[in-house]
Regions:
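Surface-exposed, glycine-biased beta-strand/turn segments
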Residues: 1-60, 91, 104, 141, ...
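Acidic, glycine-rich catalytic/binding loops that coordinate metals and/or anionic ligands
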Residues: 1-6, 84-90, 110-150
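A generic structural motif
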Residues: 33, 64-66, 120-122
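Zn2+-dependent peptidoglycan hydrolase active-site motif and core
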Residues: 42-85, 99-115
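Conserved metal-binding segment of the jelly-roll/cupin
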Residues: 91-101
Length: 150
């Protein structure tokens, strides 16, 4: 099963990053920094498992992949209108648009327009944003290992 890099050349903070503004807490995912309102492509195929709002992460979508992972897409500009729980998505299918910037604030943890992605094995549970840090999978490494393509 192939995974894609959603925004090649725009990678930012990785899983575990200890930037000073995180107050000693490790980053719980990986960030990409495309232009605000860029269309976010599904990183791989699967089904939508959850769509929700978080005060910290803003508009979020969780995808259950066909190979047993959950992918959290966070800081979306708005709740996706064309997706609902159970929607089937293929790699490259639109998940939403990048938010978190001046035009589309999305969650208190947003440091400007970007896509935050967190991943875990489905056995850890659908609430990817709440599981223990030790159960998270590094999105950059996973995508690179799984043959990232544009």
């Amino acid at each position: 099963m192939t995974y894609i890099d959603p925004f090649p050349g725009t990678r930012g903070d990785a899983l575990g990053n200890l930037a000073p503004y995180r107050n000693g807490h490790p980053h719980r995912g990986s960030d990409w920094h495309p232009a605000e309102l860029s269309v976010i492509p599904a990183i791989t195929s699967g089904k939508i498992a959850k769509i929700f709002w978080s005060d910290v992460l803003g508009n979020c979508v969780v995808q259950a992949t066909d190979d047993g992972m959950y992918i959290l897409y966070a800081h979306l500009a708005q709740k996706p209108k064309s997706l609902k729980k159970g929607s089937v998505v293929a790699a490259h299918s639109p998940i939403g648009r990048v938010g978190g910037g001046a035009k589309t604030p999305s969650g208190s943890a947003s440091t400007g327009a970007h896509l935050h992605v967190a991943m875990c094995h489905q056995a850890a549970g659908v609430d990817v944003h709440l599981i223990p840090f030790s159960q998270l999978v590094d999105p950059f490494k996973w995508i690179d290992k799984k043959g990232a393509t544009k």
